[in-house]
Amino acid sequence: MSKLYEAVMGLVVADALGVPVEFEPRDSYQVTEMTGYGTYRQLPGTWSDDSSMTLATLESSKRKGCVDPADIMQNFFLWLYEKQFTARDDVFDVGNACRNAIWTYGQGVAPEDCGGTGERDNGNGALMRMLPLGLLLEGTDEAKAAAVRQIAGLTHNHMISHIGCLIYVFVAAELLRGSEKRTALSSALERAARIYGHEPAWQNYVRLPEIEALSREEIKSSGYVADTLEAALWCLLRTENYRDCALLAVNLGEDTDTVGAVAGGLAGLIYGLDGKTGIPAEWTEVIPRKEWIRELCEGVETIRC
């Protein structure tokens, strides 16, 4: 089983876990198993925009063999308007920044000019789809940072998002190399700081070195990119198996599916499928289009920046 498939399934499963309770206040519910319906009245196992945009990014990168922003944006267009890359031919839970950027692209605007550039354009809609870049990009850290800026900027073209996405990409890359998760975070922060540490926007991530020590009350699970990255890494560091990590994430409330997806991708990479610590088989059983996802993850090892 490829690490890419395990990581992608980790993201998809946790996304689906969070879909039924998205926007619910913290502690107003308790997810313990895969459920359905709820917020969007979807069947159990149905994944949302987090997975769709991740899979759209992966499909383009595999087919092209490199990071191609225009091709990835075209895949996003096919997802939003033609229901490709969806779980059950239904597009739902699309963030405003992503919807606006893809609509703008459809009006003939160049892909690099579609993403929001303001400080308020820092939702988690770029972060949630960065996993393939973390696992597949080859090149120098500077080249990887440039690629992440391009792909994040398709929908979220502000430095706060760029930094958060790069940290996540570096964490995933460190985990893929076999680093222990705390070491992976420390190394990722060092690598990202060499590129962006001088930027004022870096201050949005100063809690990350000590994130594990924070209490649940100090962790926010909003749709803001820095909150989502903090919450996902906190869940990863506070748990020792996939199930506990994913459930901790989706039970934080608010943006449950995206916090789950961001944490779940890393947890899937660490713990794999099945076994005592891996993604529970009863959760993957209800995920639609598993064979397509598996095929998408086969035969791709690296992509050029």
Which residues fall in each region the model found?
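Structured, active/binding-site neighborhoods that engage oxygen-rich ligands
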Residues: M1-C305
